[in-house]
């Protein structure tokens, strides 16, 4: 199994404001780094529910569940957070939710998962290989406009449509089935703009985000977390690129701002507080230089922490 170093471990767990008898959710179990750290600080009455859609993560979680009765693992996308917690009868009782967004190091390092442009493997990229369509299946059917839009929107790729045209032209003779096949095509088409970044980085990120509906999942899990947190419960979220962080930042700001009224309208103090459901507990936190030196994946990570102060208004 690939070694996985958990990013911002102490900081993200501290962002939950742990109580020894609290009930917490690790929405992105992965290989269990955050979960084990949380369990290490909970007492006998504490409880941790973890979620992951990766079957290999579930195997690790099920082994931990056998060892620790305080721990429960759920197989599914984290967008189902509110539904899972309601089924457990714990809505409104959750003291903290931790989310570590994006793809994990073991997923990238396992060539068979198809996430890596450095290792040859099947062009899959699904977080859950048992569900949805693979990257190869999508690239075989999508047109130039769709591929170009995905690369530009989710990868912020300058050469998005150049790459899209080449994929559509080349696939008529040879379908794109392998990761290095796609990575080498992109490398031929695109100049290396950033010294430490492979030319295929942005395109692989974009296709992965699209195949897994990652940004839509983030919107849903943030809404779900707000719904199931107890008043005073805390949300601790690690993002790994600007698209993720933008969603998290805007969500927290919107919930801090509350209901919007027409400009110039005289408001009471109660009206000014109306609709405010979260307050940010700290400025966005980035890893230390020491952590980045030890784990280069940490370099782009950002942690945001907020606390629930009121129930959201019903629609």
UniProtKB/Swiss-Prot annotation:
It catalyses: cytidine(1402) in 16S rRNA + S-adenosyl-L-methionine = N(4)-methylcytidine(1402) in 16S rRNA + S-adenosyl-L-homocysteine + H(+). S-adenosyl-L-methionine binds at residues 32-34, 52, 78, 100, 107. GO terms for molecular function: rRNA (cytosine-N4-)-methyltransferase activity. Its EC number is 2.1.1.199. Signal peptide: none annotated. It is found in: Cytoplasm. GO terms for biological process: rRNA base methylation. It is an enzyme of class 2 (transferase). It comes from the Bacteria. Keywords: Cytoplasm, Methyltransferase, rRNA processing, S-adenosyl-L-methionine, Transferase. InterPro entries: RsmH, SAM-dep_MeTrfase_MraW_recog, SAM-dependent_MTases_sf. GO terms for cellular component: cytoplasm. Its main location: cytoplasm. Specifically methylates the N4 position of cytidine in position 1402 (C1402) of 16S rRNA. Belongs to the methyltransferase superfamily. RsmH family. NCBIfam families: 16S rRNA (cytosine(1402)-N(4))-methyltransferase RsmH. This is Ribosomal RNA small subunit methyltransferase H. The lineage of its organism: Bacteria, Pseudomonadati, Pseudomonadota, Gammaproteobacteria, Alteromonadales.
